[in-house]
Amino acid sequence: MRSIIADSKRLVVKVGSSLVTNDGKGLDHAAIGRWAAQIAALRAQGKEVVLVSSGAIAEGMQRLGWSKRPREIDELQAAAAVGQMGLAQVYESRFTEHGIRTAQILLTHADLADRERYLNARSTLLTLLRLGVVPIINENDTVVTDEIKFGDNDTLGALVANLIEGDALIILTDQSGLFTADPRKDPNATLVGEANAGAPELEAMAGGAGSSLGRGGMLTKILAAKRAAHSGANTVIASGREADVLVRLAAGEAIGTQLIARTARMAARKQWMADHLQVRGHVVIDAGAVEKLTAGGKSLLPIGVIDVQGAFARGEVIACVGPDGREVARGLTNYSSAETKLIHRKPSGEIEIVLGYMLEPELIHRDNLVLV
């Protein structure tokens, strides 16, 4: 089996906290130097690389003299602010040794949820790549709250892959890849060499939580691969403890687990909608509506809505949930939650009678709806 990275030109590389820190006690300068050297080697092969790196909070804890990760959000944000300075400095220093310029980009979900800011971020990243700069991306932990967190840098890496239409996402961790079961508990567990991104059985294999330093377990990596597949990006989950892992992957060596994007590439606008992590509300739809959306490619009409949950405004992203509670689609709503509560279960011809006006005959037009 040949590594999919060999034939990939535009890469997003995500490096976890444990691979850039000294067991959480500040940054490991030597390790960061090795990552810079490997990325420089990939660049010399003509590959474009965007780096998503953890480590800011761990570095901030070290600089502030804290031995345990704080629980209070304001202290975490303070640690991130202090540590981000060191993280950027070390990366800049190490890449300069190879004649490569770096750029620091801090993102929040709000940056990508707003269409204009999303396009601006995309334009900036593509310009940096064109200029031969290596963008180094992290979540802007200083300003985010639990409500608007990406949740982990695996998810952020997938969103960046979609944003720049990357060919592949490489998630480097302290694990060898995805196993059929937890190898610490099951001696018969075997490494999954290759599978389809988004295959339902993968999520069952990937139970478990992450380390105390980071937030992402194997499940977040599997879900990130599924999300990256929206733009056609393949994913490799591999151990960052492997010597020269990036160089070897680029040479075609199969390391870890590679998850192939088999689904059709989404149109850019629909991909943006699918990548919304926080939807503003939910509508429960009947089985007939589920069938029309998933098999017929139809719009969602008010008559197919059973229940309305949450508060949302016109133009916001809402999720469509089937009778079994499973999300089947999401899209931009033509009506607010208050309006939807009045017109649900009604044929479109009665919208004007109920509301006194009709904005659109559909609750969500098929052009503004994406299956998930």
UniProtKB/Swiss-Prot annotation:
Supply the Pfam families for this chain. AA_kinase, PUA
User: Which GO molecular function annotations are given, in alphabetical order?
Assistant: ATP binding; glutamate 5-kinase activity; RNA binding
- Catalyses which reaction? L-glutamate + ATP = L-glutamyl 5-phosphate + ADP
SUPFAM superfamilies xrefs: Carbamate kinase-like, PUA domain-like
State where ATP binds.
14, 173-174
| Keyword match Isomerase | no
- For substrate, which residues are the binding ones? 54, 141, 153
The pathway entry for this protein reads as:
Amino-acid biosynthesis; L-proline biosynthesis; L-glutamate 5-semialdehyde from L-glutamate: step 1/2
Look up the EC number in the record and give it. 2.7.2.11
GO CC annotation terms, alphabetical = cytosol
The record's subcellular location field reads: Cytoplasm
Concerning PROSITE patterns, the annotation shows:
GLUTAMATE_5_KINASE, PUA
The record ties this protein, via PANTHER family, to: GLUTAMATE 5-KINASE (PTHR43654), ISOPENTENYL PHOSPHATE KINASE (PTHR43654:SF1)
* The name this protein goes by in its record: Glutamate 5-kinase
Give the species: Burkholderia orbicola (strain MC0-3)
**Its encoding gene is what?**
proB
